[in-house]
Amino acid sequence: MNVTRTGIVLRPNNTRVLYRPFAPPSPQRATRIVGRVMQLPEEEVERLLHGVMSEFPGRHQRLTGFFGERFESVAHLLLTDGPVSPSRRLLIGSYFTQEYALESAALFNPSLVWHPDQTGLPGGTARFILSLRATGEGHVSSVGFRTGTVDAEGGIVLAPPTGFVTAPRVVANATYEKGLFLRKLVELGLVDGLVDPALEALGDSFTLSQLESALETTGRHHPGGRSEWGPLAAAIVALAKANYEIECDPDSDLSERVLFPFSPTESNGIEDARFVRFVEDDGSVHYRATYTAFDGDVTLPQLVETDDFVRFRLSTLNGPEIADKGMALFPRRIRGRYAMLSRQDGENIHLMESSMLHFWHARRLTLRPSSPWEYVQIGNCGSPIETDAGWLLLTHGVGPMRTYSIGAVLLDIDDPGRVIGRLREPLLSPTENERRGYVPNVVYSCGAGVHAGRLVIPYSMSDHATSFATVPLDDVLAALRADGS
């Protein structure tokens, strides 16, 4: 099969840094830091602040605004209510801020979707958005973005990123739908008669602060006291914090936007986003991605949704079949139901269907390892792609020496649990140049696309960098039909 490696390589760049909160290990240490800065003469404050601002020129946008926010977050530690000069406020804020090189270690596991803006392009050219897993200090992962174009001949051009990266702001007082939130509580076993008064005090939609207030009020009258009510209330608030909204600067370049861990469930990383352009039955278009939330001990599949790549809603997935990692949504409903591929057992690919996007209760086995290059395990490489021949699904297989390769299968268009074609050999296996990296002998993708009769595959090389390959779609489909299931 005529697979063309483009030679394009996206490598991690340790000069791309964002600012983020720095929190000392204890409130006592934070108090001492604030106290030390408060003792400085005003002239020394001015000198130190000038030094900070001079040391980081051109590295960040709106840094002084963030210093101000950081001061407000520790202002309660001040020992008096006396006035604090603007410069001293900013200097205190700088002591509670740090830089983070979000892609200093790796830039990998890409997924590709077609950009909502296709204007201003030559004929036969399409613009895409590439999501990437960026890994930095402490092996914390986030999701970054790039844009690019592919022409009718398969030529790919990536837009260079700007020199800035800015974490989004969490939307204040984002609303929760009471019905959906209640169902998630039920799934987690967090609802009993003792919680009812708090929920009844909430309207059909509510904010986090309203939820916390209702829980606080109910807790004061809880018969079991704080020892019983405290952990239950904390678990309910944790669920709310795992379902949140963020907003990026709409005037920023897409390469400046990042999905950085915020909730407790993802404190150690947002991993392997599999974006898909999802078309609802009414024709409306949404961009959705499953991702893996990691808190240092537990991995959980979660969902991110956006219409414009400016405002994002991140939410939990629920149900007995939500487990492990590597889930991928189909790009539309099938027979009126959402469909998603999964790998709960860590070895085989399953198909799930549900009438509700956030709840998954059943699965059926669809694909087992069958060829030597995938005897260890198989999984998906992103959402299935709809073709006239069926659903084209890229897979990854793990073989000898834990080598990861990319393969393909064809699923029935009306019954995607039925396999109608399967490659016996991989589409892509790591070459000598690709096998060297953080995790050797790996090629991997989180989502490809089809343009002008070509399958465009972004793929990572050994968990370190990212490249692209293209292959005629007809060649892939012909091989799938020839190899059968």
Residue ranges and their predicted role:
Residues A328-R332, C381-S383, S445-V450:
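Beta-rich, blade/repeat-based domains predominating
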Residues W373-C381, N441-Y444:
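Donor nucleotide-activated moiety binding/catalytic core segment of transferases
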Residues E434-A448:
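A conserved acidic, glycine/proline-rich C-terminal tail/linker
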